[in-house]
Amino acid sequence: MSYYNPVRRLEEAVQEGSLRRIKKMEAQAFSFASSPFVPIAIGFFGLGTGYFIWGGQALFKFPESTPEVNRTMGLWGFWMPGFMQFLTGIYLLTGLTWFNVFGKAAPLYMAGLAFTAYGIHWFAMAYRRYIDSDAQPDGWMAIAFLFLSILGMDVFCHAGDIPVTLIFVGLTLIYAIEIPTRLLSWNLGGRLVGFFQFVTGMWLMYCTYAITVDLALGGKAWV
């Protein structure tokens, strides 16, 4: 003979309610509003500052390289082109893959890859310079980053983004010269690398200005 068990009925009701809540949570999709504020100006400014500092010193030979100067250069290299690019790369890749806040801006994947990789390689170069260790192995590193620079140039050229394509043209020239400069101890190459770093740094500052004015003031600068 069956009888009404209020305790058991209460347990069943709690279980049913819990199951409904779990199913509702599983079905619920979290979405974030699309944002036009792509943070690439942060990476551009960081890299541009690094190129002014490292490129200017290599091009003009001022100040002369000493252990003290190299430590200062290493600190700037770690934080500006290193950390600011790495931060931008992680920001972009997270926004593209987890939260989809940048829409279908597919070339931004290339930007996220480049900012992350360049940022980490600046960490290594900055620390190498800070402790004043041998720079010759950087020539092998430059081969990989020459490939990455050519890849970025190709992607943004096909996307029709000429200003960013020009940045990757500068990067391609820098790493193409870096290879023989480091591996073959080509003395003139150091100043050529500094020259193209300095010129690319100026273009990066323009791109920083153009992006910031467009987003902050609704300007129409070419970028």
Language-model-detected regions and their locations in the chain:
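N-terminal topogenic module of multi-pass integral membrane proteins
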Residues: V7-L10, V14-F99, A221
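Short aromatic-rich membrane-water interface segments that cap or initiate transmembrane helices
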Residues: A33-F37, K104-L108, G112
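Alpha-helical transmembrane segments of polytopic membrane proteins
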Residues: V38-F45, G77-F78, A111-F115, T165-L171, ...
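Membrane-embedded alpha-helical transmembrane segments of multi-pass integral membrane proteins
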Residues: L47-W54, P81-T88, Y118-M125, F145-G152, ...
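C-terminal ends of transmembrane helices
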Residues: W54-T66, W122-D132, I179-N187
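Cytoplasm-facing juxtamembrane segments at the starts of transmembrane helices
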Residues: S65-M80, Y130-F147, I162-L166, L183-M202
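Membrane-proximal helix-loop-helix units in multi-pass membrane proteins
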Residues: L108-Y175
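Terminal transmembrane helical module of multi-pass membrane proteins
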Residues: A159-V223
